């Protein structure tokens, strides 16, 4: 603990033995760096007034507060604060055009993005009233991502027979539900340091990520026993009916990916871009993208 910040070195974790030097250097650099990294959070789920308090259902944020300064950005703002080092975006189906431009320029300036989107929001169902829709114009976050190299298939929900979770239906019968995917080590890229120490993840009615170039690395993925179902059916069908709709199609699907630079601005063709517009990425930023938001909330992230 240094200057009221907690720096963890997981050197007792056998799974991270190959990354001990990396963890040590990272911790030492954090201590020597007088500037604490500021993480901006842009989400309709996080009120700006609540970020300094303990947020019910989001223990993840309490862990982040140990190492970073967190700042909740008003959801309908038109511009990001300039002092944000990293931007965390959660469930932003609707954003103003000016904010989309600000996010684009944040990335182009060399700052990283972490983005969580979804096909069906279980924890925050009001978000299901709107849906991402890729278009030729830059209208939502999915349009930005397509320019950066990935398409989110947000109108389909992914299931996997091999990762099915037991749930209770209305008749109190236990059934295996393929759309709540308990992903084990076979579906987690253990070659990337970000995943070391993760034994399983629970992705809940997730979407699919389709990469459009080679500048990426898959982080989380299904087996080849996956399938897709239209997300609108999840609003009207019960659990058993949804299971009956599921048909596996021998395809493995990507659920999380890291995109590497270089990136081109999504607004290079816009006439109203600012005079100091940055057209291509500087200093090698990256984007970490997840096709599910529910997995970070306590009901699905904390083991009981």
Show the residue positions of the predicted features.
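Acidic, S/T/G-rich, low-cysteine, solvent-exposed domains in lumenal/extracellular/periplasmic regions
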Residues: 33, 50-304
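Hydrophobic targeting/anchoring helices
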Residues: 1-63, 74, 302
């Amino acid at each position: 603990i240094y200057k009221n910040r907690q720096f963890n070195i997981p050197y007792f974790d056998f799974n991270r033995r190959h990354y001990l030097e990396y963890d040590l250097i990272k911790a030492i650099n954090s201590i020597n760096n007088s500037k604490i990294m500021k993480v901006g959070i842009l989400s309709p789920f996080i009120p700006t007034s609540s970020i300094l308090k303990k947020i019910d259902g989001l223990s993840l944020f309490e862990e982040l507060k140990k190492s970073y300064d967190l700042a909740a950005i008003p959801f309908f703002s038109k511009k990001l604060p300039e002092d944000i080092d990293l931007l965390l975006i959660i469930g932003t189906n609707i954003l103003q055009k000016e904010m989309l431009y600000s996010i684009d320029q944040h990335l182009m300036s060399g700052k990283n993005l972490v983005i969580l989107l979804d096909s069906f929001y279980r924890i925050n169902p009001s978000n299901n009233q709107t849906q991402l829709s890729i278009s030729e114009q830059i209208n939502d976050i999915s349009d930005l991502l397509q320019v950066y190299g990935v398409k989110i298939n947000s109108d389909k929900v992914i299931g996997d027979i091999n990762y099915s979770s037991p749930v209770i239906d209305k008749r109190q019968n236990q059934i295996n539900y393929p759309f709540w995917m308990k992903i084990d080590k076979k579906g987690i890229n253990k070659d990337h340091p970000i995943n070391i120490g993760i034994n399983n993840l629970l992705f809940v009615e997730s979407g699919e990520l389709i990469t459009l170039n080679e500048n990426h690395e898959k982080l989380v993925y299904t087996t080849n026993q996956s399938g897709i179902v239209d997300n609108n059916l999840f609003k009207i069908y019960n659990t058993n009916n949804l299971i009956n709709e599921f048909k596996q199609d021998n395809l493995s699907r990507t659920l999380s990916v890291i995109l590497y630079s270089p990136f081109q601005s999504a607004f290079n063709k816009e006439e109203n871009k600012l005079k100091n517009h940055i057209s291509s990425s500087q200093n090698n930023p990256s984007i970490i993208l997840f096709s599910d938001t529910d997995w970070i909330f306590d009901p699905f992230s904390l083991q009981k």
